[in-house]
């Protein structure tokens, strides 16, 4: 399996970023990229320890994030999530059970911040019609997340 090497690469990439003079790293668990593909039930059809249950689907994201934290410290690691994203065939019909679990586990790591893509924005900056009436990440996730929360995506004067 390639997964242990992928997890190790997150730690090495974090070390490389610090060595190159960056202040920290953001783990990209959004927009249909690898970590989100494992996380979301629409894209993850695995039947091993990385598929099926919420805990299993979250495993790769949590392992990769822990590898970065172990490499450079939690205060230098943030993570970006898109609970309502649909990029690359990812997504959840009801994302809150999954993200309640993921955010609870991420809280334990003491990360620098959590960066959310708003439900009303897609990866292409267009409105996600399916989620246009879902409250802001500030309303849905703030009660779950203990640290710094950043939200982005399709803000307008009436929603900012």
Give the role of each language-model region.
Residues 1-160:
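Flavin-dependent oxidoreductase catalytic cores
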């Amino acid at each position: 399996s390639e997964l242990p090497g992928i997890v190790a690469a997150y730690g090495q990439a974090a070390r490389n970023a610090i060595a190159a003079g960056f202040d920290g790293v953001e783990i990209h668990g959004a927009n249909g990229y690898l970590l989100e593909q494992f996380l979301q039930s629409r894209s993850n059809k695995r039947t091993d320890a990385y598929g099926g249950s919420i805990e299993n689907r979250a495993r790769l994201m949590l392992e990769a994030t822990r590898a970065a934290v172990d490499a450079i410290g939690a205060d230098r690691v943030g993570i970006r999530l898109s609970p309502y994203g649909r990029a690359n065939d990812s997504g959840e019909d009801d994302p809150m059970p999954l993200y309640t679990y993921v955010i609870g586990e991420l809280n334990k790591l003491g990360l620098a911040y959590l960066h959310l893509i708003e439900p009303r924005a897609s990866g292409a900056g267009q409105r996600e019609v399916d989620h246009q009436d879902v409250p802001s990440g500030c309303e849905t996730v703030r009660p779950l997340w203990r640290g710094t929360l950043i939200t982005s995506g399709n803000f307008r004067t009436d929603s900012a």
